[in-house]
Every structure is written in structure tokens, then in C-alpha cells.
Amino acid sequence: MARKDKQGKLLIVDDNKSILIALKLLLSSYFETVTTLNSPNNLLSTLREENFDVVLLDMNFSAGVNNGNEGLYWLEQLRNAAPYVQVVLFTAYADIDLAVKGIKAGAADFVVKPWDNAKLIATLQSVYRLSRSRREVKRLQEIKREFQAEPRAMYWGESRAMNDLRQLIEKVARTDA
């Protein structure tokens, strides 16, 4: 069932094509855009081409490897290339130490395979809201910097009356009155 309130751009990176298909079917009802990659090798170029809010990143890509180091490596690459993107790590070989390493390295959350659909959706939507909030904070900080750099930008108008008023305010502001 399609939802009217779908928001956010999600990128899923996993080497298992069956998982990618299942996740795309599940999450397309909840996110505006769901893109999949079956290898992290194109991750950085994909992020340069399109702005994603959240990346769901598998932690193991090579056959026989299950220690999570590949995911941690790609997490670091992603944090450096696109610090605004929130990352949720995703693995079948989870333990507390690996989850802690991932969170310390900058992941927003950690999900274990096999996943519970409701929990996965809730996690990804929560992380999307975090991403949106952080972008809004950054936008507001930039506006604040602009106002601080150019105090005149706080005033509307360039008429003679407004210029006179600005001069009066600046004169009074320098006094103890």
C-alpha cells in the first residue's frame, strides 16, 4: 500500500541481491526514493550524483568475511565524503562490540539481519528525521552567520527613512542609555 506521506531518499548497499529486492519492495512504501547498490565500490560516486538522507550499509561484502571491517571502512569513507548523510549499519554477524564500534565511528544506528520489518522501518524513519533536523540546523546556522557578518541584512529596506533609523539605532546602541 502506497503512503501519501513518503519522504526521504534512502540508499541501500548490500551484496545480496535478494535482500536488496526485499528491502526495496518493503521500503518503497515509506520513502520517496529507494536506490540499491550491490557493491560499495560505487558508493561514493553515487553519493556525488545524488543527495541521500540515509544509507543502509551492509557490513560484510567479501565471501567468507564476517568481522564487519568492510562496513566500518565504508562508513569512514562515507563520513568523509558526505558527512550530512546518516548511516545505519546492517549485518547478520552482529555483536555488541561491533555495534559500539559502528556507533563510535559515526553510524546513527545498527540493525541486525534478519530484520523485523516494523523495527527496521521505525529505525530508518527516525534516522531520516534526524538527518532532516541536522540539515535544518545547518541551514539556520548559515543564516545566522550571514546576519552576523552583515548586520544591515537584519533590516528591511534601503529607503532614506530606513537608513536614518539604522543610523539612529547604531548611535544609541553605542551608549549606556
What annotation goes with each model-predicted range?
Residues R145-A177:
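AAA+ ATPase active-site-proximal loops
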